[in-house]
Amino acid sequence: MKSGLFSMNDIFFLVNSIFKYFLILLNGSHLLKLLYSSKENIHIIEGLLCIITGVILKLSLIYIYCTYFMNIYIIKDYRRKNVLNIFNMNNNYKRNGNVIESDDFEYRKLIKKFFFKKVYYSIKKKHKRIELYMLKIYNSNFNYYFCNIRDMCYTIIWYISLYYWRRDTYNMIWGFNKIPTYIYNMLLILLSTSYIDLVMVIISYNKSKYYLMKSKLLIDIFFSAPCTYLFSKFIFVFEHQIDIYFMMGFLRNIKIFLNVSYVRIEHNSILTNTEIKIIRIVLGVLLLCNAFASTIYTIQAIHPYNLDNENFNYFLNSYLDYFYFSIISISTVGYGDIFPINKLSKVVCIIFIFWTFIWVPIQFNDLIISIFSKKKTYGKISMNNQKFILLIGDVEPQQLNVFLFESVAQGNKLKFHLLTTYPINIYDEQIKIADHFCISLYIKNFDLNEKENINLLYSINAQNAYYLFLFSNKFHNGHYNIDTKSFTRLLILKKFLHGKKNAVIELRSNCVSNIVRSIGCENFIIVNLKHSLIVKNIKYPGFITLILNLFTAYNYDISSYNFNDIASYPSLKYIGEFNRGSRTKIFSFIVHKNMVGLIFDKLFYKLYESLGIILVGIETNTTNYYINNKKHKNKNSYVDDNFTTMRKNNMKNKKKKSFKFIYLHLLKKYGHTNHYTQKKKKKKYDNIINHHGSKSKMEYSTQLRHNNKTIKIYDEYNTIETYQNYLNYETINNSRINIYNSDEKKKKYNDVSPTNNILTNYKNGKLHIEKRDDFDNNNNNNNNNIVKSRKKGRENKNDEIINVCININSDIKKKYNNNNNNNNNNDNDNNNIINDHDNYNIYNNLNSNLKCRCLPNTKKNKAQNVNNVTNNKDNDVSVKRIKTHLQDDNTIDNKKELKCYLNLLGKNYAIRDSDKCVVIANSRKVIKYLSKAKSLFWIFEIKSKKKDNISYDLKSVIKTKQTFNKYFTTNIKKKLPTTSIQNNVYVNKNAHIIAMNYHDLFNTYRISRIFTKNNYNYKRKNSRKKHLFRNLNGEFNETKLYHHCNNTHNIKTTDKKNMEKLDKLYFSTKLNSKSNTNIHIHNNNNNNNNNNEHYDDEIKTYYFNLTEKNSHLLLNYKKQLKKKNYINTCYSVNKSDESINKIKNMNSDNNNINSNNINSNINNNNNNNTKLNHTLKNRITFSYMEACEKYFPTENRNNKLLLIINCTCNIIQLIKMFNNKYKYNVIILTDEIPTMNIMDLFKYNVVFIKCKILDDYNLINSGLMNAEYILILPTEAKNINEINEIDMNTIIVTRKITHLLKKKKRTYYINNIITELINPSNVIFLEENKMIKLKDKKSSYDDFFPYVNSSQFYSSNIICETMLYNFMTHHKSFTDFSVCTNTLECLIKFLRIIYICDLSKYYDFSFKKIKTFRDLFYFLSKKNIITIGLYRKGDKKVPFYIYTKPNENCLLRFDDIVYIL
């Protein structure tokens, strides 16, 4: 690591920091020089004491402010350690000191071997922290009032000193020799305090234009050391340099005027806003006149030396005359009795008069606007080229907080332009925060939908916006209408932005999301995200806080807590672990060049070992076949499996084309990089059953021989349809080419015989086209024409193969189409011999190299199709290159969206150039280094010593090649030279290419050596065949069955009779799938045995005909049958008495149930029919017991209970996501019942309990003690003024429920309760004993996120829509290392939990070996599981908390819950 750590920004930071501290040192030395130069007026020791007094006074006030008004980590940490030493508890804290680490321990690991860089890093970190706190102190109200008081004291001292000023004429310089010593001492105290303020300004100096517009800073600059030195040496020549501060004292009057004119108006109950503005105008005019008078008095006043008596009267009369002159000059009266004498005084008069003309009308205008109209704008528009974010729509104040803090946390200091429909006065707190952190903010009250004023967008410079965020209003019902309004705004902006795709829109539902995606803009569906997080948090506790900590930039500090009692100290450990985990964030960065080609597993372990970073997954925009291989789900019965496979095949036939390739692990061991193997598509439900009773996959191979040249023609469906396939072939010397013909337009096969014509091969090598009917008749006689796949594999096992897929030219199609039509018209010509070789020309371009790659396996171990490309100009055959994991994709389509693939352990995935690594880390600096460093060899344990003068880049290529060469066999290494991963693989021009499919590899090598049972179950097909025909053997042979299938007709599912037959058929097949006996179904009426046997025959034939011939009809029938059987089995409402009797009798005959029991059950069902028919209309009860009796079936009463308090309009979406597997009973306790689909209520086991008051009785009566999970939702707010009232009602209910559970229930867990709030600031009222503490003491993070100090947030028991906007701000407009939206979706989908106590199922797990988080991390990684964090129990103060990415030495506990991927 010799380079890559110091960048240009680091060098600029060093230069800037050195210059800042040089200015601080210069001003301090100048202050001491002032003391040394004025020995006659000031004693040195007294002056030093005065300077020390002023510095101590200012620092003490800062300390008081930091202790009681702000939380600074250093001071609070020092004080906390001293308190712990007093109580002898510091030893316990030191034992757990490794738990609470710095947030940048990863960066310290990075630079642990480099001393100077380590020193630089520590200085930079401390400087950034000091800079942040100095900025906060300097812009605080406390410092503002202190500076005003200091300036007033300075002005008073200056007015007192005017009495001692002397000069005889105005051309002379004032003499200050008569000023007493105590005035000099007081001046030194004030100068020393102002020096501390100047130090804070210099340290926190970041934005020059923002600071230069500050009037108080401009005046303070005149009192800095460089300015005073220039004035005292070149402009005003004084014997003592300290006299310059008396000469420039009039500037303090101007500063007081400016502070009063732009004072921060606070809300109070004494004065209104209008009264404050009137007082400010009056005081401003008086201070302006005073500043004018003091300036003119300094320029042209006279106070002679010879006046000994009446000095004070002379001074007072002289100053009043100039005050009178300032009033008549500002009021433009101009009597002329007093006038400016010299040019300097005239310039001053002009400046003050113009200043008055500008300032006074502006103040009166603001006064009139505040009285008669509402304020519609705030701030200034940024017209420069600085980046700014444009927020449009119904932006709430808390949402704006998220955006402001994200800018502060990332250090971007972006400007924000806000076009909102809300009034500006609700953003008062946000305006203070923006001014506090020096963020430029412009707010405009404007609705873009109403006026569609494009000129306004131009006026705010919206066309140059870095990014646009559009918000929706959540206080109105009808999400579709809200989204339509937001989409209208997007269309207006889309037209205005001229095709730019830098907009993000917030939606409330999925209705408009597809349209927004089609435009090319990003969408953020807030309601669906909230529901998914709630559902995930219910099943996996702590999930909400875990995800928020990963995607939010805030950092917590222990110092933000006020521990006033000794009982709070045990919670310090838990809070410290939570705070350390909250610093962990998720990042994505473009892979480094040294990472390209590495296997994911190796990179995963190396990053964790060297830097402590967890590699979670990758983001890529290329198609990858290795990722997310889902295991095949086991089906309970053959019928369900049969239905699903038929449906999948129908979908594949529509989307996919002809050919697929063999599995990747075969090609790794036995294939060449230039070879491929062809896998035939499976033929299901189209094959002909021979008399032996097994399906045979038929292959019809043809050979065309001419002058020792062989061409093999092979069709994907084993037949070549003469009206679709067109081939031309020309002779090539000493070449053998295999042609795989793929149909561009497939024909849907619904009959047993799909085509009429078939191409057969005779011994003489000629192609013969005959009809399918004739071929079927001669099928048994001509068995030689049917070539078995395994036999063919034995013949061609030694041939070499290349993947060449050919599309036939359209001109040849037309030519051959006419010939085919002519052949079909001749009915008597059954044997048409094709002798004309000119009709079969193969356009093979030998000059172009055919590129090919091995194709890895996809989700179900199947290969992808090869798309054929035809060159219409030259009639040449072009082959599309197939990329693999061995090939770097350098040409990537930027239009593709990034997709995230998590946990690629064990999938043998190799990193590409275009990939982005998704990591979980603590330090943003480390991520920046990994993406931009010049060399990363030291991380991967590559020696830095050079050998044979080989550069590091070449060395990395050699290392990468050696890793990839391990996957090839020795035969390949002998035949081909080793090439780099970036080079393309070409086919030799004179290579012999012979046809071969995947069956050859099965016959050549034993399957047991190739596959394992986990990778490929080669016995699966045979087992399914046996399962299909297991219940059909016995009395019937397959030929008769096949003949019967051809004679049957399609069954229409709409007929009632056919439906009854299918009912019997379905139930019989269900019973047969469970037992090995033959099918025996008895009718309800008395029939003879012959009818029963004949009925059995019909059932079997119908069953086979449905599965083989009428699959699409059976699928439609199954859909109807599911709905029918669901209502029959669960509710028995829509069934008639006869149908119920039929089903009961069928079940009784098969299961030997007594008829008496059946009759009793039928009677019970008939009695319940009336009740159930009534409950279909309304599912409203008055108690939990009544709901169990009426609405919850007996089989569902043991399900877990979810209690939802209050009902929203979209509650059914939440229930569908939570109860998708019907394993929960849902009770909604509400006052108003919304309109919902009655079938959804039955399907998802939902019952309403209506009550007006949520008292203790109604809560317990609704099943509170039996509820496994409790979800408390707020009622819908109509406007923004109802938010706090609704939240307080929700908080009261939450605290009441927790009190009841503690009182009534022994096993009470706080993590089973989730409360949703509208305003997250109200979370402080959820804390029983911390409301006043949290309200009085705020940190910098509490200004933005008031919920961070709540134990409810620790345990992930609260959620708010405003909290979810942190995901929206984790965007590329704020940071360079943001993840894509698909990463968030994948985390919500794939993140799981494991209990530590359940890890004993692994035979190699033991707490003796696995004690720390590091041990657990490596143990689960061997199982291809990535560990992210822990969910732990605490104490009464902190019941539960999340510990994200714990320390490596963190000790595990038996009750921990582990978050895994």
From Swiss-Prot:
Pfam families for the chain: BK_channel_a (PF03493), Ion_trans_2 (PF07885)
Transmembrane segments: 44-64, 142-162, 183-203, 218-238, 242-262, 281-301, 349-369
Subcellular location: Membrane
SUPFAM superfamilies to which the protein is assigned, alphabetical: Voltage-gated potassium channels
GO CC terms: membrane; plasma membrane
One GO MF term: potassium channel activity
Record field: intramembrane: 322-340
Record bears the keyword ATP-binding: no
Keywords, alphabetical: Ion channel, Ion transport, Membrane, Potassium, Potassium channel, Potassium transport, Transmembrane, Transmembrane helix, Transport
InterPro entries on file: K_chnl_BK_asu, K_chnl_dom, K_chnl_Slo-like
Null mutant phenotype: Repeated attempts to generate a knockout failed.
Membrane topology: Multi-pass membrane protein
GO biological process: potassium ion transmembrane transport
Gene3D superfamilies according to UniProt: 1.10.287.70
Predominant place of localization: membrane
Annotated region described as Disordered, given as residue ranges: 771-794
Further facts: In the Saccharomyces cerevisiae heterologous expression system, localizes to the intracellular membranes of the yeast cells.
Described purpose of this protein according to its UniProt entry: Contributes to transmembrane potassium transport.
SUBUNIT field: May form oligomers or interact with other proteins.
Identification of the protein by name: Potassium channel K2
Organism: Plasmodium falciparum (isolate 3D7)
